[in-house]
Amino acid sequence: MADTGSVHRGVAWQAQALYVRALLRLLPLLINVFRHASPKIRAEIDYLQPGYTFQLSVQGTDFAGTCRRTDAGSFKRVPPARIARDVEPGSGLPSSDPQAVTVDYVIDFRSLPFAFRCFSGGETLKQALGERAFSTRGPNDTGVALTYMFTALLKMFFGWRAAYRNAPKARRRAA
């Protein structure tokens, strides 16, 4: 008889993996759609220069999504084959291959469950950062812009989740 605990863990992992892969694949589309609805997202995108490239990845898997800002201010997905292999992503070093795309900033989640919790609205980026759910590589100024952009994006997408709802305001007592 199979151990049902490991079977459930396997199914849960596969469901989380499918969800995270789908969101990584859809990331440029989501950014491009939500930038039209949010001035905050637009402001952070405007801070990033055309050609700026960032990557979200999940340790222990081959899951990664790489996006590059266009001259028009939208983001396009970068296929894995086009990413520079001769320099560390987020290092700021140029590639010796002029056709390769160098990654300017990397957000690397420690594990699939951490990525899933962030991508599903189960916890905010601030909470995830507090528990060291991800590490980053790249310049701090653009990292802050990406963090603000993702916070606004996730709040719009998951505003109904407890992690993103505003704390209840204290009610005044009638005197």
Each predicted region: which residue ranges?
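Feature captures hydrophobic
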Residues: 1-175
